Curated annotation (Swiss-Prot):
Database matches in InterPro entries: DIOX_N, IPNS-like_FE2OG_OXY, IPNS-like_sf, Oxoglu/Fe-dep_dioxygenase_dom, Plant_2OG-oxidoreductases
Lineage, top ranks: Eukaryota, Viridiplantae, Streptophyta, Embryophyta, Tracheophyta
Manner of cofactor binding, per the entry note: Binds 1 Fe(2+) ion per subunit.
Organism whose genome encodes this protein: Malus domestica
GO molecular function: flavanone 3-dioxygenase activity; L-ascorbic acid binding; metal ion binding
Entry protein name: Naringenin,2-oxoglutarate 3-dioxygenase
Catalytic activity: a (2S)-flavan-4-one + 2-oxoglutarate + O2 = a (2R,3R)-dihydroflavonol + succinate + CO2
Length: 364
């Protein structure tokens, strides 16, 4: 069933609807514009110079992956005009009337299209975002009927953007392969027939941003993700299991790169899978475009390189589909346990109220 409305149409409301209100422990701890410079910004200029800067760039990328699992890249070779076109057309789409966007509603198991909000199956609280999803690679899996036809140029621009990002992702995976002592193509080959999904996120202004998230805390399941974000701010990362958070400083024209669970496992845990979330604000909307590079469903997941003195972090090889199902099952179980704990807490509070009443009131 298609959603009745869009977030854009309710962003003017003064009070946040209950379905978006998160538990206190999940609410933002750092402001969307309280920027940190802890995430490295790495220039890729000279990355193709085997005898030149490639070694230096490789060291910086590896250090970032071992420390945070997230870094930013500039001088990456993706045409600035293409980036501008992609972001401009995306904003045009989200500015369309609700009925136009809902023509491409993705509910009901459709492959690609428009989504109003998102949430984990079995979880009641929803994220404050609107989404357009394109499945871009393998090319044979593209279903252009699920790609919005407005603005008119967006489909063609998305094709070019997808091609550019595929090349950039493979280049970065090549650097990480070499760092693991493997052939340049090792990580790309481990993906078998690499899948690419482009997710365009639009975070409208929010009436009470301190009560919700644009995208809840998570790690990406795939190999590597390249994120293009505007200058508003809202991407946050943690490396101490959520005790402290930083807001990633937006850099004009840069891509934020983060490793996913698959990349983490292939490196035998050497490279971190970035733990991150997105927060929103009441001052302005925010746009980001995430390009997820994932392995084929049948790809075998197992460490490609185990360093001396270490043991494999997986007991046995599994398929990517099995890995993904385990991740989803774990997330659902955590959501179920949290729900039970909340219900128990509520019952305990009610019982405490009864226990503290005067005897005359209890038997009245």
């Amino acid at each position: 069933m298609a959603p009745a409305t869009t977030l854009t149409s309710i962003a003017h409301e003064k009070t946040l609807q209950q379905k978006f209100v998160r538990d206190e422990d999940e609410r933002p701890k750092v402001a969307y514009n309280d920027f940190s410079n802890e995430i490295p910004i790495i220039s890729l200029a000279g990355i193709d110079e085997v005898e030149g800067r490639r070694g230096e760039i490789c060291k910086k990328i590896v250090a970032a992956c071992e420390d945070w699992g997230i870094f930013q890249i500039v001088d990456h070779g993706v045409d600035a005009e293409l980036i501008s076109e992609m972001t401009g057309l995306a904003r045009e789409f989200f500015a369309l009337p609700s009925e136009e966007k809902l023509r491409f509603d993705m509910s009901g198991g459709k492959k690609g299209g428009f989504i109003v909000s998102s949430h984990l199956q079995g979880e009641a609280v929803q994220d404050w975002r609107e989404i357009v999803t394109y499945f871009s690679y393998p090319i044979r899996h593209r279903d252009y009927s699920r790609w919005p036809d407005k603005p008119e140029a967006w489909r063609e621009v998305t094709k070019k953007y997808s091609d550019e990002l595929m090349g950039l992702a493979c280049k970065l995976l090549g650097v990480l392969s070499e760092a693991m002592g493997l052939d340049t193509e090792a990580l790309t080959k481990a993906c078998v027939d690499m899948d690419q999904k482009v997710v365009v996120n639009f975070y409208p202004k929010c009436p009470q941003p301190d009560l919700t998230l644009g995208l809840k805390r998570h790690t990406d399941p795939g190999t590597i993700t390249l994120l293009l974000q505007d200058q508003v701010g809202g991407l946050q990362a943690t490396r101490d299991d959520g005790k402290t958070w930083i807001t990633v400083q937006p850099v004009e024209g840069a891509f934020v790169v983060n490793l996913g669970d698959h990349g983490h496992l292939l490196s035998n845990g050497r490279f971190k899978n970035a733990d991150h979330q997105a927060v929103v604000n009441s001052n302005s909307s925010r746009l980001s475009i995430a390009t997820f590079q994932n392995p084929a469903q049948e790809a075998i997941v197992y460490p490609l390189s185990v360093r001396e003195g270490e043991k494999p972090i997986l007991e046995a090889p599994i398929t990517y589909t099995e890995m993904y199902k385990k991740k989803m099952s774990k997330d659902l179980e955590l959501a179920r346990l949290k729900k039970l704990a909340k219900e128990q807490q509520s019952q305990d509070l009610e019982k405490a109220k009864v226990d503290t009443k005067p005897v005359d009131d209890i038997f009245a």
